Amino acid sequence: MTKGTSSFGKRHNKTHTLCRRCGRRSYHIQKSTCANCGYPAAKTRKYNWSEKAKRRKTTGSGRTAHLRDVHRRFKNGFQVGTPKGARGPENH
């Protein structure tokens, strides 16, 4: 029996399937855990030894890009309406 390359050709069962949280094919079927995001754990899996992976997944890298300007609007108190100068000269 060989335990190297020739044995790998005989493998045909899927160990990982799609994860319902991160969408990657990293959910280990027998372990019932995701190798990428750590599902079903409450906290998302992330490590400091992979700075690049953290950069890919962090807030503001996808649909939450609008959060970049939330901080600026927070500083101004979430003002609404047109700014004072844009209304034209004020005549009383």
UniProtKB/Swiss-Prot annotation:
Name of this protein: Large ribosomal subunit protein eL37
Region span, Disordered: 50-92
Give the C4-type zinc finger regions.
Answer: 19-37
Please report a single Pfam family linked to this protein.
Ribosomal_L37e
Q: Keyword RNA-binding on this protein?
A: yes
Identify the keywords attached in UniProt to this record, alphabetized.
Metal-binding, Ribonucleoprotein, Ribosomal protein, RNA-binding, rRNA-binding, Zinc, Zinc-finger
Family of this protein: Belongs to the eukaryotic ribosomal protein eL37 family.
Give the top-rank taxon of the lineage listed in the UniProt record for this protein. Eukaryota
Q: Gene3D superfamilies, from UniProt?
A: 2.20.25.30
Role played:
Binds to the 23S rRNA.
Q: Which organism is it from?
A: Emericella nidulans (strain FGSC A4 / ATCC 38163 / CBS 112.46 / NRRL 194 / M139)
Q: Which gene encodes it?
A: rpl37
